[in-house]
A protein has these predicted regions:
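Short, low-complexity N-terminal regulatory "tails/caps" that precede and couple sensory modules
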Residues: 1-35
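Short loop/turn elements at sensory-signaling interfaces that couple input to output
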Residues: 9-11, 148-163, 170-176
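PAS-family sensory domain signal
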Residues: 33-90, 185-193
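PAS-family sensory domains
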Residues: 79-148, 215
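Regulatory hinge/linker segments at domain boundaries
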Residues: 184-207
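Short alpha-helical "packing" element that flanks the helix-turn-helix/winged-helix DNA-binding module
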Residues: 208-215
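Recognition helix of helix-turn-helix DNA-binding domains
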Residues: 218-246
Length: 246
């Protein structure tokens, strides 16, 4: 079902902006300062703003987690020790099967290809955004998730080797996955990649596709009604039809 929870959305945006500021700051730091940044990142995992999120630090050279917050168990049923032992391979166990296939076969390769064309300075400014579903391997509960991640440091050849990320329960749930790549330029952002993969077997009308695009941007039904010069009731009817098709 497509829905919006404004309070939770504001909380996510506030935490994400704090994370972005941290990442912007390390772009000008010396290598020896990275360790203190990572320790600060870990400490934020237990504060009130991030208690309902998963924060992680991933070593991109050996694809092992250097840190994962304890809240990972509530989302996935897995304990931090499982993440440390299995590394990135654990994703196939905690992400819904069809989502994992779409991410690994389509979105990840395309997003990485875009980023490899960027300069080192631009890579420091990259923010990845992913929408998918986690599945708790103990309870079977499926949770829509939005994940934001960025590169934290690079080796001498300009290759990223440390990535930090945050996962939240998403305020938007749809039958598919989405991947975005943005460049953080001060107060402005440029989206350089945005693709959504739907699993629907039904054909959406042009109006329904437009409404989905608005919803993915975080617009509410009143805003959509005003922009498209239709009644709020019509927007709600479209959303019900979209839900049935998805």
């Amino acid at each position: 079902m497509l829905y919006l929870t404004i309070g939770k959305e504001k909380l996510i945006k506030a935490s994400l902006e704090a994370h972005r500021k941290e990442l912007r700051a390390i772009a000008s730091q010396k290598e020896q300062d990275i360790a203190s940044f990572l320790e600060s990142f870990k400490s934020h995992a237990i504060d009130g703003l991030n208690i309902n999120s998963i924060r992680y630090i991933l070593n991109l050279q050996d694809l092992k987690y250097e840190f994962i917050s304890n809240s990972c168990t509530a989302f996935t049923g897995m304990k931090p020790v499982d993440f440390y032992g299995k590394g990135l391979q654990i994703l196939s166990e905690i992400i819904l099967g069809k989502d994992f296939n779409a991410l690994s076969k389509d979105l990840f390769p395309a997003m990485n290809a875009i980023v490899q064309e960027l300069s080192l300075k631009e890579k420091y400014a990259v923010v990845f955004e992913l929408h998918y579903h986690m599945q708790n391997n103990r309870t079977g509960k499926i949770t829509p998730v939005v994940e934001y991640s960025s590169y934290a440091d690079f080796d001498d050849q300009g290759r990223p080797y440390i990535s930090t990320g945050i996962c939240y329960e998403s305020v938007l749930d749809f039958n598919g996955v989405r991947g975005l790549v943005r460049l953080n330029r001060g107060e402005e952002q440029e989206t350089i990649y945005d693709r959504t993969i739907y699993y629907s077997i039904y054909v959406l009308t042009p109006s329904e596709k437009k409404i989905i695009a608005y919803l993915l941007e975080g617009k509410d039904y009143k805003w959509i009604a005003s922009t498209e010069f239709i009644s709020p009731h019509t927007v709600k009817t479209h959303i019900k039809n979209i839900y049935k098709k998805l």
